[in-house]
Amino acid sequence: MGSGDAENGKKIFVQKCAQCHTYEVGGKHKVGPNLGGVVGRKCGTAAGYKYTDANIKKGVTWTEGNLDEYLKDPKKYIPGTKMVFAGLKKAEERADLIAFLKSNK
């Protein structure tokens, strides 16, 4: 996976993620959990958010690599997730979005 463009990643977040997620560290949850500081956080552990058992049991710590895999096809990576988003098929868009999420600490 190449290094992404965080500015473009922010645009992708606003277009495709912001309906269900916030990204400011410590921000409120929406339909989905707040994603501020998600890189390096264990899956299913954002305080105050009710995750599915599938997300909790996955037990991974989010890295660039597994976020890329998840964002490509969320329901394949975590069967039983309640995330309805179909995924980002373009590797460049995933790299940009991950660069944006990493920049948000």
Swiss-Prot record:
One Pfam family named in its UniProt record: Cytochrom_C
GO molecular function, one term: cysteine-type endopeptidase activator activity involved in apoptotic process
Keywords: Electron transport, Heme, Iron, Metal-binding, Mitochondrion, Respiratory chain, Transport
UniProt entry tagged with the keyword Cytoplasm: no
Subcellular location(s) of the protein: Mitochondrion intermembrane space
InterPro entries in the cross-refs: Cyt_c-like_dom, Cyt_c-like_dom_sf, Cyt_c_1A/1B
Main location group: mitochondrion
Protein purpose: Electron carrier protein. The oxidized form of the cytochrome c heme group can accept an electron from the heme group of the cytochrome c1 subunit of cytochrome reductase. Cytochrome c then transfers this electron to the cytochrome oxidase complex, the final protein carrier in the mitochondrial electron-transport chain.
Family designation: Belongs to the cytochrome c family.
The protein, known as: Cytochrome c-1
Organism of provenance: Drosophila melanogaster (Fruit fly)
Lineage start: Eukaryota, Metazoa, Ecdysozoa, Arthropoda, Hexapoda
Gene: Cyt-c-d
